[in-house]
Amino acid sequence: MKVLIGSDKSGFGLKEEVKAYLAGKGYEMTDCGTLDPEQPKPFFEAAPIAAQKIQSGEFERAILICGTGMGMAIVANKFEGVYAACCESTYAAEKCRAINDANILTMGGWIIAGILGCEMAETFLTTGFTENLEEWRQEFLKGAKQKVGAIEESIYRKG
């Protein structure tokens, strides 16, 4: 699977750990964020790059890391069809995929330790929408996804 990853200066260390870990697991990694901490790319520049690549279908999933993960999530979620989830546990990384079908995981480099970040990223990439949920909940969530899509459609199609 091709995975897009990016960070600002605050998320650089964690991003490098996660990128190396996932590459070692066979993921094809593309970095759209800070490549050199001496020449950082701010979160408000890295997140739109990732969001647009998700929108276009060039990538199915992305991982973005800033200080708290929140700035990346806020900016990425401005783009239609992008569902960025700021997570601080492996459980949340799993559930943002299984319940919400998130396509971008955001994490905080000031908050998440390296091994946890690697586990969260792998869980995010290997969990499918409605995976391991009861049948009634799967049906509910598929319907909810359509309703959320209709809300999104009404917002982006105004004017």
Curated annotation (Swiss-Prot):
The keyword Isomerase applies. It catalyses: 4-deoxy-4-sulfo-D-erythrose = 4-deoxy-4-sulfo-D-erythrulose. One of its GO terms (biological process) is D-allose catabolic process. It is an enzyme of class 5 (isomerase). Keywords: Carbohydrate metabolism, Isomerase. GO terms for molecular function: ribose-5-phosphate isomerase activity. It comes from Clostridium sp. (strain MSTE9). The active site is at residue 66. This is 4-deoxy-4-sulfo-D-erythrose isomerase. SUPFAM superfamilies: Ribose/Galactose isomerase RpiB/AlsB. The keyword Isomerase applies. Its EC number is 5.3.1.37. Part of the sulfo-TK pathway, a D-sulfoquinovose degradation pathway that produces 2-hydroxyethane-1-sulfonate (isethionate). Catalyzes the isomerization of 4-deoxy-4-sulfo-D-erythrose (SE) to 4-deoxy-4-sulfo-D-erythrulose (SEu). InterPro entries: RpiB_LacA_LacB, RpiB_LacA_LacB_sf.
